[in-house]
Amino acid sequence: MTVLKNDRFLRALLKQPVDVTPVWMMRQAGRYLPEYRATRAKAGDFMSLCMNPELACEVTLQPLDRYPQLDAAILFSDILTVPDAMGLGLYFETGEGPRFRKVVSSPADIEALPVPDPERDLGYVMAAVRTIRRELNGRVPLIGFSGSPWTLATYMVEGGSSKDFRKSKAMLYDNPQAMHALLDKLARAVTAYLNGQILAGAQAVQIFDSWGGSLSSAAYQEFSLAYMKRIVDGLIREHEGRRVPVILFTKGGGLWLEAMAGSGAEALGLDWTCDIGDARARVGGKVALQGNMDPSVLYANPAAIRAEVARILARYGAGSGHVFNLGHGITPEVDPAHAGAFFEAVHELSAQYHR
């Protein structure tokens, strides 16, 4: 077992005592960093970067080299690697985001989808995890991740990004049996994928339910949360002599925190529309919380960033069980110095809550 030099991220997820509130940031390896842009240019395009374990490792480590305050690394990859491995043919259209060459539109299409084997069909991701773990050498924990079944299904049925999820929701209401068949297959695929990452060295995993908040309350419970619970139930929960915590993040899921707290996950990610103090009261100590500063605060000056960090820390209050993060990913236009001011403020201002 690798001895972790800094395990406060894992300790906070398990609500164990920490000296300061740990911090990391969704999309911390990303386009706001000039060093990331240079490595991406070297790779040629986004998917070539994802599929090269050495370059994926390089960009994963870049934010840690720049910001010594970071308490976790997150695997550099994309949620759509799973549908790509199911044969849909992922590509990126400039200005339009991800697209698939094949779409899923019928029960026959769903029946034909394979459940990918992580080592055989997504071996480049597993190789990246192993490479990153080796290079981290116990510096901080490594987070693995996947998209949720519902979120992946929307891309597969729409053929890419969507504003209204028209085709996905039409299938959900017109042919719920077909949607359940797709989600069942995706739940099996995601479980295998995350377990593959854990065996390769991921020390915590996050399920990104980016589009769960687009659903009605009843549909969320049936078509998103139920399948995430199934994944949590199927995950390897102890590896290398440690608990492997699971973080469940539904963007727009603030109405359903009580239900999410019963998922079996150790922590819930919050977007910035929730008040973290209210969220803490609502989940009643069942889970840790991650979040939840509005990413747009990073456009403001460092004093304003510091003030918002102070406000969120005060709303959470004393004790462990909080991992500081943004409420969604950092945006490409942010000044890297502002991200640094954010990380510094979290560590400096949170110590008083852990005495």
Curated annotation (Swiss-Prot):
Family annotation (InterPro entries): UROD/MetE-like_sf, Uroporphyrinogen_deCO2ase_HemE, Uroporphyrinogen_deCOase
GO MF, one annotated term: uroporphyrinogen decarboxylase activity
Reaction equations catalysed: uroporphyrinogen III + 4 H(+) = coproporphyrinogen III + 4 CO2
Database matches in CDD domains: URO-D
Family: Belongs to the uroporphyrinogen decarboxylase family.
Subunit architecture: Homodimer.
UniProt name for this protein: Uroporphyrinogen decarboxylase
Organism of provenance: Azotobacter vinelandii (strain DJ / ATCC BAA-1303)
